[in-house]
Amino acid sequence: MTSSDIHENVRAYYREAARTGAKELAADGRWGASRYDDDTLARVPSAAADLSMGCGNPHAVVDLQPGETVLDLGSGAGLDVILSARRVGPTGRAYGIDFLDEMLHIARANAAEAGVTNAQFLHGMIENIPLADESVDVVISNCVINLAPDKVPVFAEIARVLRPGGRVAIFDVVAEDGLDRVTDASTDGNQWANCGAGALHHSAYLRVLAAAGLVEPSIQYTHNTGPGRHGAIVRARRP
């Protein structure tokens, strides 16, 4: 399976989710809105929470400040962008990037319903972020980077758009070192699209962060997502 094939499988999987919803993920406890507290979810449109497909809550670990610019990679229905926009306030800015027009349409409607005016949703690939160099203070993401066929350009782009001193605070699925693939990702695109086959091993993840020039990398497991795989907080900083 080529990188293009993987992208198409992921695109088809999440396009269908945009059409049918993802509320059942929250019942699992490992995914989606279940990773957020009820008070937080009560303050956002239900359509944003119902389409949450992440593996954590970036806002539990990132200390956003008023006036900051934050970027959410793979912003989906807009939940984390809406929360970010409120935390950075009217002097700040929250961007979301997604490669699906269907998700962008939903996210923009959710932001409008939430009364958020300092958020912008952009069409693009996380391997080619449509923002200027050194334009962002914080990059967040929620169970999206594992979907990329090649993580190296993703983190190179993250480093490019971060300002000096900017920080990374993302949730992703990370595989334990030594774990064999559960399935052959070259023939089963669904295992990639549902956050299985694309997970980097722990040590490989740290190497990719370092190769991008990011410093103080750390990975903290939060919960199991499958055999040998974990939802994890990934942190780093641009020097």
Task: Provide a role label for each language-model segment.
Residues 197-212:
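Short alpha-helix
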Residues 139-140:
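Hydrophobic beta-strand segment of the Class I
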Residues 174-196:
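Short, glycine-/aromatic-enriched active-site segment of Class I SAM-dependent methyltransferases
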Residues 152-167:
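A short glycine-rich, Lys/Arg-flanked "PGG" loop and its adjoining helix->strand segment in the class I
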Residues 30-69, 83, 87:
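Conserved alpha-helix/loop element of class I SAM-dependent methyltransferases that forms part
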Residues 1-34:
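N-terminal auxiliary segments of SAM/dcSAM-dependent transferases
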Residues 65-128:
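Class I SAM-dependent methyltransferase SAM/SAH-binding core
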Residues 212-239:
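Core SAM-dependent methyltransferase catalytic element
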